[in-house]
């Protein structure tokens, strides 16, 4: 049985994968959680923690799929520990570093969190993760998202945010890797803008690209079936 490791993004936890993981029962699906961690000051440190975690649960080979910040961890992991990977994927994520404008925006967001706490940040950012039409049609899902993740500890949310801010560009890794790479994009994603990132899918030797026309940044919730089918198809290539 193949092992699939799903890495959650920033401002959520591993429960975000529950709707999707139930549709992937033919695989061993692992969903590590680092949403409350405060010890890791860089994306590379999260990747080192993940390596130790995988070894501790007996994983020798896996496919790693990272959502948003989880994608940044995935790339750092692929750079440091390639022998463990049969394949990897970026799920609403990017290999680019932040440009200067984005870094300035993040500094303001960081100051907001330091002054007002993580709950205020989640109330502001959570709804923007979903496509507008989905949010309008599913207000309870968005409301539950905000209520659930407003409980995350502020210091952990800030720690993760700082690591995201300081991550390097890893586009070279996509060009150099020999394992299959999956890209899942949301056409309505306001955070990982489709038009700016679709070109990344041309870099790997073996790439599979999925475009979710109606999804924003939360395809595992907005279009669960399409995501599950795409992942199953991809795992057949690894």
Predicted regions and their residues:
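Catalytic histidine neighborhood in serine/cysteine hydrolases
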Residues: 194, 198-217
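Short beta-strand/loop motif that positions the catalytic acidic residue
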Residues: 177, 183-185, 189
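Conserved hydrolase catalytic core segment
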Residues: 61-99
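Active-site glycine-rich loops that stabilize anionic/oxyanionic intermediates
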Residues: 9-12, 68
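The conserved beta1-alpha1 loop
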Residues: 7-9, 185
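Catalytic histidine-centered segment of alpha/beta-hydrolase-like enzymes
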Residues: 215-228
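Conserved alpha/beta-hydrolase catalytic His-Asp/Glu region
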Residues: 98-104, 116-176
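Active-site loop/oxyanion-hole signature of alpha/beta-hydrolase fold enzymes
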Residues: 15-22, 27-65, 80-81, 229
């Amino acid at each position: 049985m193949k092992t699939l490791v799903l890495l959650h993004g920033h401002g959520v936890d591993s429960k975000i994968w529950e709707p999707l993981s139930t549709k992937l029962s033919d695989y061993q699906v692992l969903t590590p959680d680092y949403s409350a961690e405060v010890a890791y000051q860089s994306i590379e440190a999260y990747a080192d923690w993940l390596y130790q975690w995988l070894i501790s649960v007996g994983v020798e080979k896996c496919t790693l799929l990272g959502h948003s910040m989880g994608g940044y961890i995935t790339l750092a992991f692929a750079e440091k520990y390639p022998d463990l990977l049969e394949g990897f994927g970026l799920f609403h994520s990017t290999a680019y570093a932040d440009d200067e404008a984005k870094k300035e925006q993040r500094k303001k967001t960081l100051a907001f969190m330091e002054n007002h706490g993580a709950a205020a940040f989640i109330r502001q950012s959570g709804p923007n993760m979903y496509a507008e039409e989905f949010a309008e049609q599913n207000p309870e899902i968005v409301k539950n998202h905000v209520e659930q993740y407003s409980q995350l500890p502020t210091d952990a949310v800030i720690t993760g945010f700082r690591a995201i801010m300081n991550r390097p560009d890893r586009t070279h890794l996509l060009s150099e890797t020999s394992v299959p790479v999956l890209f899942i994009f949301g056409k309505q994603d306001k955070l990982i803008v489709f038009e700016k990132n679709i070109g990344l899918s041309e870099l790997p030797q073996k790439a599979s690209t999925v475009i979710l026309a109606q999804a924003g940044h939360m395809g595992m919730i907005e279009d669960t079936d399409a995501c599950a089918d795409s992942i199953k198809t991809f795992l057949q290539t690894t």
